[in-house]
From Swiss-Prot:
Cofactor(s) listed: FAD
Family: Belongs to the geranylgeranyl reductase family. DGGGPL reductase subfamily.
Protein name: Digeranylgeranylglycerophospholipid reductase
Keywords from the UniProt entry: FAD, Flavoprotein, Lipid biosynthesis, Lipid metabolism, NAD, NADP, Oxidoreductase, Phospholipid biosynthesis, Phospholipid metabolism
Species of provenance: Thermoplasma volcanium (strain ATCC 51530 / DSM 4299 / JCM 9571 / NBRC 15438 / GSS1)
Pathway(s) the chain acts in: Membrane lipid metabolism; glycerophospholipid metabolism
NCBIfam families recorded: DGGPL_Thplmales, GG-red-SF
Claim: NADP is one of the keywords in the record: yes
Cofactor binding, per record: Binds 1 FAD per subunit.
Residues binding FAD: G14, E33, C44, G45, G47, R100, A124, E162, D283, G295, I296
EC number: 1.3.1.101
GO biological process, one term: glycerophospholipid biosynthetic process
Length: 396
């Protein structure tokens, strides 16, 4: 049996950040990753804002940054004039295009340098509970089943959120309309603007969008995310993306060198995400932005919060619902209002015709916005064409 102050389950950005901060706080910390290699396979578009790196004290490094972009462009179905967002206004997914596998390894290395132990190829198999408190996990490590006892467990096991479900947190269960099926190619020999990430809305990606994240030197991540309410299987999703590529002048002559698929949660902030001795972070806690589908930044921030509350709980030997509620309050204060608005917008946008989407994009592309958010965009539309946003007025 092994004993730690903090056990972190999952070696993605949220888990590594939680482990790094917990170790920096002087807590004996173990982070486990079920795969043999942290960061592989890559399962996202790889976009991240510059501000999040600064907030989490992560120094930008060329080893994990493939490209720095000026901003983002959002195209309506007709692909005429796009909405252009400068990177400092464009949210958590615009600024850097990462080499995600190298980024994840870098964060894990920071955790190890801070003093955390790291085990790879070590999946959690079950929850250990004592007197109503989560007290650790059973883990397969080096072909043995090991019991790891911990004063606090931080589950950062991604979309599957297995540990939270095993522990009995029903909030992690998702409705169908809150699940996005995603598929992405890494493409080479393409001709796209390296200064902008591009997003395409409409029936080309039902209940979602297509993205092009340029990585420089004729390479980009080209992917699609669509609600499973509209897409019935991965082949159908692939066909939508292939049709888009065939009709895109800068992509149609390119070649794909990698294909990745996965699921993404796009729900409102859901509670509870704790129980005595357990906190969920990142996608395991359903903290993905419902509009963008981006989650790296939110995983990092929630990992920092979880480590902060772990320190306070362990130092005071208090694992009560009231103590765990401090983490939930931090999460709600940071994400709840924005995610609710973006979730409602996501639901409404999925119902709009291509004609209406084009009208919305045309209206916003004419505006000069000081900040970029769902709220700011809707207010800009309402000022000029209030009838267009009548069905969205509850978001403003």
């Amino acid at each position: 049996m092994e004993t730690y102050d903090v056990l972190v389950i999952g070696g993605g950005p949220g888990g590594s950040t939680a482990a790094r901060y917990a170790a920096k706080y002087g807590l004996r910390t173990l982070m486990i990753e079920k795969r043999p290699e942290i960061g592989s396979p890559v399962r996202c578009g790889e976009g991240l804002s510059k501000g999040i790196l600064n907030e989490a004290d992560i120094k930008p490094d060329k080893s994990f940054i493939a490209n720095e972009v000026k901003g983002a462009r959002i195209y309506g179905p007709s692909e005429k004039r796009p909405i252009i967002l400068q990177s400092e206004k464009a949210g958590n997914e615009v600024g850097f295009v990462l080499e995600r596998d190298k980024f994840d390894k870098h964060l894990a290395a920071l955790a190890a340098k801070a003093g955390a132990d790291v085990w790879v190829k070590s999946p959690a198999l079950g929850v250990i509970k004592e007197d109503g408190k989560v007290a650790g996990a059973k883990i397969r490590h080096e072909n043995n089943v090991v019991e790891v006892r911990a004063k606090m467990v931080i589950a950062a096991d991604g979309f599957e959120s297995e540990f939270g479900r095993w522990a009995g947190l029903k909030s992690v269960i998702l409705a169908r309309n809150d699940i996005i099926s995603a598929l992405q190619y890494r493409m080479i020999n393409i001709d796209v603007d390296p200064d902008y990430t591009d997003f395409y809305l409409g029936s080309i990606a039902p209940g979602g969008y297509i993205w092009v994240f340029p990585k420089g030197e004729g390479m980009a991540n080209v992917g699609i995310g669509s609600s499973i309410n509209f897409i019935h299987n991965r082949l159908e999703l692939k066909n939508y993306l292939d049709r888009f590529i065939e009709n895109h002048p800068g992509l149609k002559k390119g070649q794909d060198i990698q294909l990745v698929t996965g699921g993404v949660s796009v729900s409102k902030v859901k509670m509870p995400i704790t129980m005595p001795g357990l906190m969920l972070v990142g996608d395991a806690a359903r903290l993905i932005d419902p509009i963008t589908g981006g989650g790296i930044a939110n995983a990092i921030v929630s990992g920092m919060y979880a480590a902060q509350v772990s320190k306070e709980a362990i130092e005071s030997n208090d694992y009560s619902p009231q103590m765990m509620g401090k983490y939930e309050k931090l999460v709600k204060d940071r994400f709840e209002r924005k995610h609710l608005r973006n979730w409602v917008a996501k639901e409404k946008l999925a119902q709009l015709s291509d004609e209406t989407l084009d009208k919305l994009v045309d209206i916003v592309s004419e505006q000069v916005l000081t900040t970029i958010s769902v709220e700011a965009i809707l207010k800009a539309i309402a000022e000029k064409y209030p009838e267009v946003v009548k069905e969205l007025e509850d978001l403003i």
